[in-house]
Amino acid sequence: MNKHASQPRAIYYVVALQIWEYFSFYGMRALLILYLTNQLKYNDTHAYELFSAYCSLVYVTPILGGFLADKVLGNRMAVMLGALLMAIGHVVLGASEIHPSFLYLSLAIIVCGYGLFKSNVSCLLGELYEPTDPRRDGGFSLMYAAGNVGSIIAPIACGYAQEEYSWAMGFGLAAVGMIAGLVIFLCGNRHFTHTRGVNKKVLRATNFLLPNWGWLLVLLVATPALITVLFWKEWSVYALIVATIIGLGVLAKIYRKAENQKQRKELRLIVTLTFFSMLFWAFAQQGGSSISLYIDRFVNRDMFGYTVPTAMFQSINAFAVMLCGVFLAWVVKESVAGNRTVRIWGKFALGLGLMSAGFCILTLSARWSAMYGHSSLPLMVLGLAVMGFAELFIDPVAMSQITRIEIPGVTGVLTGIYMLLSGAIANYLAGVIADQTSQASFDASGAINYSINAYIEVFDQITWGALACVGVVLMIWLYQALKFRNRALALES
């Protein structure tokens, strides 16, 4: 059989694991901001701070996770350990109604599991292809889109469980999903024998005071404890600063050690893509915070006599990603003609443009709410769907470029740095942006009145901010296109 005729068989086990990881992560994420404000009665500012701290630290730990996978564990073992930790974290989160301390501990455990899982699952997928394999981009688009099956089901299932039963039941479903994904992945273990395994030589060398696996176990226990303190003391911003400095230092070291100009050029492209990804996700991550509270407070959620739980709206974005992702992976064929860098920047411009359009629709929705008291459901659905479509032109493109780099032994670390900037820093910025909507007053009875004008202003500013990014990216695209054209003309002459 032609090796380029179809996707590798192992990809379907990775996709299955990704589906259930998305179910687990996004099921919990859909509930978290609502849990903090509606159940624990945090004010908006406090809720945004904890939510953005959690989402930021979730993307800090992939640097350590990528390092452990590159040097010790291998991508396969790192992914399995990460999935197990996330399942444990969701179980503990379900008990946070018993005592508030469980909230911080559970978020810390999930953060550690996510760090081992997130960057390394992409690298594991990259190991299934040769660097020049044309199926690579399609494989990443397929994984990204298929993973959103879990994102679609999770807010519906977890939102329904929370609404009809309890918050603990909603969070418990997220844990069940992660365990299911891990079991399926283990069933396909034989298809990953050619991927990198545990580096036993390194393990044997780390036996000072403790046996081989001792230090790894200490790390798995000590890291959640440390992150729990960061949440409790609200020191996460300091951890973010330290992680960013370390990440940029590692990136500079990789750049200096690059063997030729081609490798340095690839690194510069990755850095620039990461910057615009960071801005994109600072806008997109409003979906789990300010947009979620906007829907809860200002959108008419009645449909055929049933009030749709707010958490279920998180499925709209994922549904758009899945449908459009399958279309891009299997219907739209990637052209091998032309310059790859030019195509990359064209996709980024389209993604940022769609994000701007999505927030333009949300601005109209908020203005509708200001005039009539509540916004219409179809307008909200359209805005979230457009924003979901935009995602397909950002992360899959950047991740594919990272795994394509020809510097050995750095893909895990580079992916971790990408997650740090486009995830951790972006989520911190998203929290700062979301906090601009936390304007409220109290009436004579003591009830809280939330300001719709704050949402209008923030959504409108994001619309124009994303549009400005499109302008810059289009200039880069034009520069690269002209450069490629001039080079082609020079070769012809």
From Swiss-Prot:
Membrane topology, as annotated: Multi-pass membrane protein
Keywords, comma-separated and alphabetical: Cell inner membrane, Cell membrane, Membrane, Peptide transport, Protein transport, Transmembrane, Transmembrane helix, Transport
Record flagged with keyword Protease: no
Record's keyword annotation contains Zinc-finger: no
Chain ranges passing through the membrane: 14-34, 49-69, 78-98, 101-121, 138-158, 167-187, 212-232, 235-255, 269-289, 312-332, 344-364, 379-399, 413-433, 462-482
InterPro entries, per the entry: AA/pep_transptr_DtpD, Dipep/tripep_permease, MFS_dom, MFS_trans_sf, MFS_Transporters, POT_fam, PTR2_symporter_CS
GO molecular function, one term: peptide:proton symporter activity
GO biological process assignments: protein transport
Stretches assigned to the Cytoplasmic side: 1-13, 70-77, 122-137, 188-211, 256-268, 333-343, 400-412, 483-493
Subcellular localization: Cell inner membrane
Topological domain ranges for the Periplasmic compartment: 35-48, 99-100, 159-166, 233-234, 290-311, 365-378, 434-461
Principal location: membrane
CDD domains registered for this protein in UniProt: MFS_DtpA_like (cd17346)
GO cellular component labels: plasma membrane
Function: Probable proton-dependent permease that transports dipeptides.
Family: Belongs to the major facilitator superfamily. Proton-dependent oligopeptide transporter (POT/PTR) (TC 2.A.17) family. DtpD subfamily.
Stated name of the protein: Dipeptide permease D
